[in-house]
Regions:
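Jelly-roll (double-stranded beta-helix
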Residues: 1-211
Length: 211
């Protein structure tokens, strides 16, 4: 990237980056029929958007893991059962879990009622209401779906098959968002300025760093 960082993401690894005032990076995935990954963007508060860019690699062996009753939880960020995650955002305090659930197993997670919570189902299927049935196809959520949950203090799932999903929860910033391609700011004017800087080669603010 434009900070001079480079690395290889292997099976189970994680990459964390703060774009801040501007960073240009390139990803070159190796072709594979079995590759599975997720890229999540967290919006920074307006007052922190122009912070210095940062980057870090997190190895799979450094990610805390909890295994019990047919459920495996990898704690990427936040805290679960007294264990802190592999990293913590400086500006956004988020719970980020990678969960694997055996078929017919149940798992629940207490959440902050003031936070937004969503999951993305990598594979498998499940129900999210104890009053629903995994035998009823209309009650079951399938793989490759993102699910945003409403207000509440407990997340609950029962797997209708072996299932893997990521869970993310954080307090909403409640600020406007202007998004265009790889850039997220707060207003259309800021977005226009950012693209002008890209065209003029002034987007990267640390001019002593070379690509």
């Amino acid at each position: 990237d434009s900070l001079g960082n480079k690395g290889v993401i292997r099976d189970g690894d994680c990459q964390w980056m703060t774009a801040g005032s501007g960073i240009i990076h390139q990803e070159m995935p190796k072709a594979s029929p079995r590759m599975l990954g997720a890229q999540l963007w967290l919006n920074l508060p307006a007052k922190d958007k122009m912070t210095l860019p940062a980057y870090g690699d997190i190895r799979s062996e450094d990610i805390p893991k909890v295994e019990k009753d047919g459920v495996t939880i990898r704690i990427l960020s936040g805290e679960y059962e007294g264990q802190k995650g592999a990293f913590e955002g400086r500006y956004i305090k988020a719970v980020y879990l990678d969960v694997e659930l055996s078929a017919c197993r149940e798992w629940s997670f207490e959440t902050d009622p003031d936070s937004t919570l969503f999951i993305y189902m990598f594979y498998g299927k499940g129900i999210f209401d104890p009053e629903k049935s995994i035998e009823n196809p209309k009650d079951v959520f399938d793989e490759r779906q993102a699910i945003l949950f409403g207000e509440g203090s407990v997340f609950w799932i029962k797997g209708a098959a072996d299932t893997r999903f990521i869970l993310l929860s954080a307090k909403p910033i409640k600020e406007p968002i202007a998004w265009g391609g790889p850039i997220v700011v707060n207003t259309r004017e800021e977005l226009k300025l950012a693209f002008e800087e890209l065209r003029n080669n002034t987007f990267i603010k640390s001019h002593d760093i070379r690509l």
